[in-house]
Amino acid sequence: MSGVIVVGSQWGDEGKGKIVDFFAEHADAVVRYQGGNNAGHTIWHGNTKFELSALPSGILTEGQLAVIGNGVVVNPEALLAEIAEVQSQGIAIDNLRISNRAHVIMPYHIALDKAAESSTNNRIGTTKKGIGPAYTDKISRVGIRVADLVDPDVFAKLLKEYLPFKNAQLTKLYNEEALNYDDIYETYVEYGRQLAPYVTDTSYLLGQMIANKKRVVFEGAQGIMLDVDHGTYPYVTSSNPTAGGVMNGAGVGPKQIQDVVGVIKAYTSRVGEGPFPTELHDDIADHIREVGHEYGVVTKRPRRIGWLDAVALRHAVQVSGLTKLAINSLDVLTGLKTLKIATSYTYKGEEIHHFPASDTWFEGLDVNFETLPGWDEDITGVQSFDELPANAQNYLKRISDLLSVDLLSFAVGPKPEETHLLSDVWQ
């Protein structure tokens, strides 16, 4: 086995890209297996910062493939823009591979996403990038795949078949303008021409690599608590960020996976609507938001802030089979006198240790916290676990104990050199 999954284990924005990039230095391929350009990751390449949402994190690491799997929905315009940005810094992208089975985000997906979000009072806070409508078409079997995009004749046939129905939705349901066939065809055929050199059967490619003992990292987008099945439905994404999403979204089998690394922050954050049991609305939240620069990479919206939630994290451990834990942003908590971790909930007088499926439960939910002492020492320069203040060490140990998952790494800053391993993920 030589496959490792790195998955966000909260509501996204946990710093997965940094961890993936960190492990990618010793990998032969990095694979995105779900989501689209609705979730960004910030990655440092030397002293240059990249904010990517379409390209896999591994694109910046020389020596391994960066793979967009079949479970991803691809926005060709956004992808080509990021390719141009990376190339402008002198970084080659010959290592990019795109699944011919991945679905394409079309202009009508974006238009319908914007129209639907603007027309309802029950908004779930989408990024309006067409992700949900693209996945809807995939499940409805009226989607256009990358294999279709790179074949002008097939693309023309499908666009002629699907566009009238999409235009009827836009004009009749939402009072929006219809989209022009010729404009879409000419633009997207050119996108297909530019992307064609990178398109291949990535499932076959990855199967061959793993069979030959190559090291492959699978990179989840968003987080487990945004999973369409296991997250805070309906305030979720439209795909499966859980480890199980790798099987469908990359086309590999469970026996090919060695470890599942769950990435979390030392606290909790969330963008958009939806339940958030440990959310704070005080000076502590403001402090964490400013010190941690808690604003969405894609949306730029201020993130909601809360204490660490061990109940939600145990749910993440269960549904993704986490074997290792990477804890980021420990430095953000420096200076807080006390820290809290949610260990259980109380609902209608009964203590519960599982994460509720129904969002109506959260209206009457009380959170039970465990309080730990904080630390004042500056930890940004530490080089090992033993150099951390005792209270910081105890905080990390307590998280590991509550989740029954071994600690793989901790981070005291955003840069790669500020992440410290306690063991080798590839052992």
Swiss-Prot record:
Enzyme class: ligase
Pathway: Purine metabolism; AMP biosynthesis via de novo pathway; AMP from IMP: step 1/2
Keywords, in A-Z order: Cytoplasm, GTP-binding, Ligase, Magnesium, Metal-binding, Nucleotide-binding, Purine biosynthesis
CDD domains assigned: AdSS (cd03108)
Subunit structure: Homodimer.
Family: Belongs to the adenylosuccinate synthetase family.
Protein's name according to its UniProt entry: Adenylosuccinate synthetase
Organism: Leuconostoc citreum (strain KM20)
Lineage: Bacteria, Bacillati, Bacillota, Bacilli, Lactobacillales
Annotated gene: purA
